[in-house]
Structures are given as C-alpha cells and as structure tokens.
C-alpha cells in the first residue's frame, strides 16, 4: 500500500483517483501532479514502484499544501475572520451559515439540534 503525505492510498484504484484521498488534492491537482512526474493516469496504486512514489511525494511537497498544514491554514483563516469582526467571522462565531442562506427554517447542519424555546 502506497503511503503519501501520511495517507494510505487504496491499492486497487487508479492513481489519479487514489491521490484524491489526500486532503487538499482533488482530481485536477492530481492530474497536474501526475503530468509533472510523467506517471500514467491509468496506472493502479499497487503498480507504482518506490521511484514513482518518491517523485509524487517530492512534487506534492514542492507545489501543494496538504493534510495537516492545509487544515491549520484554513483554521487560521477562519480565526482571522473572527478576530477582524467581519460579517463572515461573526457568522462563524455564531455557528450560522456564512454564504447568505436563509436560516428561518433550514440550516440545521450549521445550527445543530433544535432547542425548543417557550411553552411553559
């Protein structure tokens, strides 16, 4: 099993889809990485040799922010919005949607379980 950026890639998948299991790498980025390293998209993960894995790892380290570093960066960006006091930061702080959705009836995912108010 190939291990790239701390993630075990599924053996039987094609490498272009296997790389998407790494947080921060989608299909487009996966194809760019494979183009840069010269590895065929249709190759399966179990068919990769050590040189291929090393080349992919080197390319990812050189040109992509992935896994823990990316999660940390996203968290810091959200924290910066909250510290600024921007509208998006306030919505994050209150646990409400940031992108303009209505909240009168929906938004249960962001708001969490219902809290009944009133009726004595």
UniProtKB/Swiss-Prot annotation:
GO terms for biological process: translation. HAMAP family: Ribosomal_uS13. InterPro entries: Rbsml_uS13_C, Ribosomal_uS13, Ribosomal_uS13-like_H2TH, Ribosomal_uS13_bac-type, Ribosomal_uS13_CS. Residues 93-120 are annotated as: Disordered. GO terms for cellular component: cytosol; small ribosomal subunit. The gene is rpsM. This is Small ribosomal subunit protein uS13. It holds the Pfam family Ribosomal_S13. Part of the 30S ribosomal subunit. Forms a loose heterodimer with protein S19. Forms two bridges to the 50S subunit in the 70S ribosome. One of its GO terms (molecular function) is rRNA binding. NCBIfam families: uS13_bact (TIGR03631). Belongs to the universal ribosomal protein uS13 family. Located at the top of the head of the 30S subunit, it contacts several helices of the 16S rRNA. In the 70S ribosome it contacts the 23S rRNA (bridge B1a) and protein L5 of the 50S subunit (bridge B1b), connecting the 2 subunits; these bridges are implicated in subunit movement. Contacts the tRNAs in the A and P-sites. Coiled coil: none annotated. Keywords: Ribonucleoprotein, Ribosomal protein, RNA-binding, rRNA-binding, tRNA-binding.
């Amino acid at each position: 099993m190939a291990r790239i950026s701390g993630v075990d890639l599924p053996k039987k998948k094609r490498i272009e889809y296997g790389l998407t299991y790494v947080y921060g790498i989608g299909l487009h980025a996966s194809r760019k990485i494979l183009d840069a390293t010269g590895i065929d998209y249709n190759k399966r993960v179990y068919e990769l040799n050590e040189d291929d894995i090393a080349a992919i790892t080197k390319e990812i380290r050189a040109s992509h922010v992935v896994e823990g570093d990316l999660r940390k960066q996203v968290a810091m960006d959200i924290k910066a919005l909250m510290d600024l006091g921007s509208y998006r930061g306030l919505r994050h702080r209150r646990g409400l949607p940031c992108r303009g959705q209505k909240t009168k009836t929906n938004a249960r995912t962001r708001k969490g379980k219902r809290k009944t108010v009133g009726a004595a």
